[in-house]
Amino acid sequence: MDNRVNVLGERLERVDQMTQGIIDAAFLPVRQPVPREVWWKHVISFYGDEDELFNQVRISKPVFLDYLALVLDVAWERRGRQGAIRSNRERLFFLMTFLSRRISVVEVLVARFIRTRDHTIRLLKNIAVRFLPVLKVGMVRFFDERVPDVPGCSMIIDCTSWQVKKQALHFDDAFAHFSGKHGLYCLKKEVCLNIRSGTAAIVSKSFPGSVTDIQVLRSHAEEVNAVLDGSSMLADLGYRGVQADVPTIIVCDREHIPSRTRRVLVECYFGRLKMLWSVFAARWKLGEQTFDVFFDLACCFTNADVLRRPLREADKTFNDGVRNLIQAEREAVLQDYRVRSAQYRQRRRTELGFAPN
């Protein structure tokens, strides 16, 4: 027991030394240096002491070091000075912080410098717009791989919606964002997945909730056709009638099992996205342009996660269970049909006198 206490004490001491050293290094002079004491004094005066600070923001000292450069950048940019975010890794970490809804930690630490949330959101949007083209090239890609169980098909398409606040006081003005299917005001996004890898290949712009799935697809049908290059894609019943614009395989309720199993992959992708980035699991309170930027960014990071942890392998047990249920349901329907057919034939034979009573 004493050895465990000693080891823990030594580890905490090393963490304190590392924390203090990195904090000191973070305040090295820049073009217009800001002393560490100036920022630290404001923060401590707001919370009282260091223990109360870490208890309030609910993070440990090592985690606090990751946020330190971001906090200083937000605080110093308020004064028009050079920020502390200098590397791409730190900027991407800032974006992932927002997508994971841990931006409140940054807001609490800069509360003495920035009174509103708008300034932080503007900073995030500027960074996101700068990195989004590079991330799209690297992570939103199409492998053009076919699967043997669904011949001639290379993509899966579906739409998903996010609730937004009512855009106007009068219902006629806000009717465009109202979805009769979901019964709420929402924004709609369409995602085309690679059928084998499960990564997003095409992400449409946002549309009001009243726009149908077919209208969303027809708005960028040329891009989809260029990516398909003669192959087809899987879609649900909401896309019936779009075959004239884009080669589509409509998966009906009683379609063969491989197509149904493959089409469910897009639902798994939406679930993975909302699981990783909780900011998309709740109502979106910002503007439509901001929604487009951060949704595309979330798809880039989700693609990276899917390539590391494939959807099909991660959900293999669940998918096997769904496949078995579908197969059992189909067998039950066929068996019921056989029984009813035999009963009908026997009754008709009896009525026509071909069989004894």
Predicted stretch roles:
Residues 61-64, 91-92, 214, 218:
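Short, well-ordered alpha-helical scaffold segments within catalytic/effector domains
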Residues 101-357:
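Short, well-ordered secondary-structure "scaffold" segments embedded in the functional core
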Residues 88-102:
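Short, amphipathic alpha-helical "recognition" segments used to contact nucleic acids or chromatin
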Residues 1-82, 311, 318, 327-328, ...:
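Charged, often Cys/His-bearing segments associated with DNA-binding zinc-finger transcription factors
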Residues 53-57, 83-87, 97, 113, ...:
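Amphipathic alpha-helical protein-protein interaction segments
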Residues 7, 14-22, 38-39, 52, ...:
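Acidic, Ser/Thr-rich intrinsically disordered and amphipathic helical segments
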Residues 78-85, 283-288:
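Short, surface-exposed loop/turn segments at secondary-structure junctions
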